[in-house]
Amino acid sequence: MRKRIDILIKSGVSKVFICSNTPHVYFDELQSQVKIEMISIVDETLNRISSLGLKKCGLLGTKFTMSKGFYSSKGMSTGIEIIVPNETEQDLIHSIYMNELVFNINNQDSKIKLIEIISRLIEEEGIEGLILGGTELSLIFDQTDFDTIKILDTCIIHVDSIIDELV
């Protein structure tokens, strides 16, 4: 990824955006190595959560995104608690994500399973919001599927911040 960023810098870009959640595990390391501003999907999502006054949010995404803690560690530093599904649920979410959503397959049975996981996070963990920490997750549900929590689509949040930066 560093080589690609170097190519972008040589081409004259003024900012770099990594428009995917999972690679953000390397974001801070990359940012420290380059002399160009990088806009983080994680930071922008946490900024949005903070602006909404939410303190406890669930996180769905690839198993890597859910388990590596880069949302949780940055969230803790801003007073936002990030709750991830248990390991069995993470395996199911990852399977649906990699075997269906990345291929644009919208399976209603899978949607029901995901909603059951989210419902558990609402009831047992008290989440106030849900981070769609995988850019394909918005293919299967959005805010209209939930009335008690705020859905935070990281892709939309990141694009909004990119537009704000460039306008």
Language-model features and meaning:
Residues 1-167:
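Non-catalytic structural scaffold of enzyme domains
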